[in-house]
Amino acid sequence: MTSQSLRDQAATFGLTTEEYDLFVSQLGREPNALEAAIVGAMWSEHCGYKNSRPLFRAFPTTGPQVLQGPGENAGVVDIGDGWGVAFKMESHNHPSAVEPVQGAATGVGGILRDIFAMGARPFAVLDSLRFGNPDSPRTRFLVNGVVDGIAHYGNAIGVPTVGGEVTFHPSYQENPLVNVMALGLLRHEDLATGTMGEVGNQIVYVGSKTGRDGLGGAVFSSADLSAASQADRPAVQVGDPFMEKLLLEATLEAIQAGLVAGVQDMGAAGLVSSTCEMAYRASLGITMDLDKVPTREEGMVPMELCLSESQERMILVPVPGKEQALHDLLAKWELDVVTIGEVEAHDRYRLTWKGEVVCDLPVALLNEAPKYTREGVESADIRAARERDLSGVPLPGDLGAVLLELLSHPTIASKRPIFERYDHQVMTNTVVVPGAADAAVLRVKGSPMGVAATSDCNPRFVQLDPYAGAAAAVAEAARNLACVGATPLAITDNLNFGNPHRPEVYYQLQQAVQGIADACRALNTPVTGGNVSLYNQYTEGDHKVAIHPTPTIGMVGVLPDVTVRASLNLKAAGQTLLLLGHRAEKGWSDSIGASQYLETVHGLEAGQVPPVDLDLAQKVVDGTLALIRAGLTDTAHDCAEGGLAVALAEMAIAGGLGLNVSLDAPASVRADALLFGEAHSRVIVAVEDAAAAGAKLDELGLPYAVLGETVEAPKVTIAAPAQHVHLSVNLESLKTAWEEPLKGILG
């Protein structure tokens, strides 16, 4: 192939013609087709973060709790007593849109490899899923496929799926989001990194044989979805959880035996990405012999060997002098183990095939993709929606019926039909089962501690105000951890956005990153890593439809004593309900802006996103933790989608008890805003000793309100005298509305 024809075909490699010219200029000669394909993969958004990395400078990434920050396979935080938690979230959006079962399954497999590549034993998975219209046959196909894929891989490998979130909105109709978060435990001394070490070190391929599945996956995930994407099924990998289990055990045994100097998962862009990233971290060069790569298909050529994304494969670099011991250990697990190359004292990435050099590129060139800082401009339509006057929105006549309607919305309704497909008790570390509390809680065996994890984002907030919406996602994650008794430690993020070449999309990305950064600083939760998934949009007629911007936040925290925790279910009649974060000087929730209620009942996505007071957010976290750790409450629940009334109903449904609540809001507050508005930094707790709880909150300077009490009668009663509201709905009706919707979608 001539140099001109390569330039003409730059787009097939994932490069613009300008990027191709830059590549040639930096290389100082014309590349061959393999070299162009390798650079295309490494400069893709999926691998090179060329539209997003310049924004990451805003993130706080350090702190005394951070053992490993961004740049490795996963972040690691210190939880005390010599223990660390490795955690990370990644997306498998495009593959899941094309082949939902394998797309989701391999998403689980890939994130688990990132965790055990750090020397940590995976012990939990959470998934954050976004789908389109729940009544659509395509949505039902995608939901069932994705859930089956996650269940298949997680259940088979023996790692519990312990939590997550599921959202339904038309913007995800053709482009679902599958974000998977994994956590693993490790001793500090077992922390591993992805480096080549020193000159002379061997490069060892271990795991499954290489096939043609996943070819072009990195480039496929860095472009818009279209009707032609359905033909890209070969770009979707095929997973084998039983092979991954062998690879997991072998890798951890090798690390703990002190045989490994460096370890890296083969993920996006396969063999190339994993090895050139390791070389770049070490500031060294490598030479590899592609003839030695184990294959499962006949006639594979260098481009396929380099860019295949076949699953369950790792690169290990032995400690010098322990090469044979490593080979013997890995062979015991019946894995393919082959030395395919060596670390050398130069700066080149060299590949040979049949005795000839077929690739010779600077390591830095591969790893330093061009970076773009684009101009972001807010969409005029979105600004108009945010500034819309909502005073004319009619007040529903039957607010009890509205509560039932909100509880039956698939985004709010019970996710039991989903999580009951997952084995959430395998490994026997799960202390709080999915749906029982605002975050997952896992025990650390041999220690009194527990680890909590959550994933959160309200895409509607981010659509209307990306800065406030992203900051709100961080604050909500922190509240959710506090509601189980965990101190928030750090986050991983999964930034899902549309095409960054569109100014209105780049604006959303810019603003969301800044919102995350500011919230993380305020709440002392550094960013330890994450994932960016752009080009999440599809064509509908003559229009490009982007997803709602979805910066999903995965957050971990620690419980000093896992037996001192809280859940959301009401536990006894006669307890007092307190609303933490209620600001008497500012009144009750006084807006229906950006609420699930406004969208569901009135068909509007409009209005101001409730402002995020980060000082109050920290006080609510501190106050919730203080009450739980003082033994003053074991019941706590965050107010989120659906507002105060939905949160109270969820607590009653979970506990099988009723409640009587009276809200003393002034007459100027709309009844629907009072019940269903989504003001931030609010947590409901149930306490036996209201005086002691109040004294503790006063000591902390945290505002609160007394809502009412729990009762035996199976009925939720909410009165608001100034609004002439007296809502009373029996528990059975609430429970039916909440439990049934997803049963009709799954099956």
Swiss-Prot record:
Transmembrane stretches, start-end? none
Q: Where does substrate bind?
A: S91, H92, N93, H94, R113, Q237, E309, S310, Q311, S533
What the record says about family reads: Belongs to the FGAMS family.
**Where is the protein found, in the record's own terms?**
Cytoplasm
Q: Give the highest taxon in the source lineage.
A: Bacteria
Pathway the protein takes part in? Purine metabolism; IMP biosynthesis via de novo pathway; 5-amino-1-(5-phospho-D-ribosyl)imidazole from N(2)-formyl-N(1)-(5-phospho-D-ribosyl)glycinamide: step 1/2
Q: Which gene encodes it?
A: purL
Reactions catalysed, as given in the entry: N(2)-formyl-N(1)-(5-phospho-beta-D-ribosyl)glycinamide + L-glutamine + ATP + H2O = 2-formamido-N(1)-(5-O-phospho-beta-D-ribosyl)acetamidine + L-glutamate + ADP + phosphate + H(+)
Q: Does the keyword Magnesium apply?
A: yes
Q: Any idea which positions bind ATP?
A: Y49, K88, D493, G530
- Task performed by this protein: Part of the phosphoribosylformylglycinamidine synthase complex involved in the purines biosynthetic pathway. Catalyzes the ATP-dependent conversion of formylglycinamide ribonucleotide (FGAR) and glutamine to yield formylglycinamidine ribonucleotide (FGAM) and glutamate. The FGAM synthase complex is composed of three subunits. PurQ produces an ammonia molecule by converting glutamine to glutamate. PurL transfers the ammonia molecule to FGAR to form FGAM in an ATP-dependent manner.
| EC number(s) given by UniProt | 6.3.5.3
Which Gene Ontology molecular-function terms are recorded? ATP binding; magnesium ion binding; phosphoribosylformylglycinamidine synthase activity
Per UniProt, Mg(2+) 1 binds at E90, N531
Query: InterPro entries, from UniProt?
Result: PRibForGlyAmidine_synth_PurL (IPR010074), PurL_linker (IPR041609), PurM-like_C_dom (IPR010918), PurM-like_C_sf (IPR036676), PurM-like_N (IPR016188), PurM-like_N_sf (IPR036921)
Where Mg(2+) 2 is bound, by residue? Answer: D114, D265
Q: Subunit comment for this entry?
A: Monomer. Part of the FGAM synthase complex composed of 1 PurL, 1 PurQ and 2 PurS subunits.
The cross-references to NCBIfam families, in alphabetical order and at most eight, read: FGAM_synth_II, PRK01213.1
One GO cellular component term, please give it: cytoplasm
Q: This protein is called what? A: Phosphoribosylformylglycinamidine synthase subunit PurL
Keyword set, alphabetical order: ATP-binding, Cytoplasm, Ligase, Magnesium, Metal-binding, Nucleotide-binding, Purine biosynthesis
Which residues participate directly in catalysis? H46, H92 (proton acceptor)
List, in alphabetical order, the GO biological process terms annotated in this UniProt record.
'de novo' IMP biosynthetic process; purine nucleotide biosynthetic process
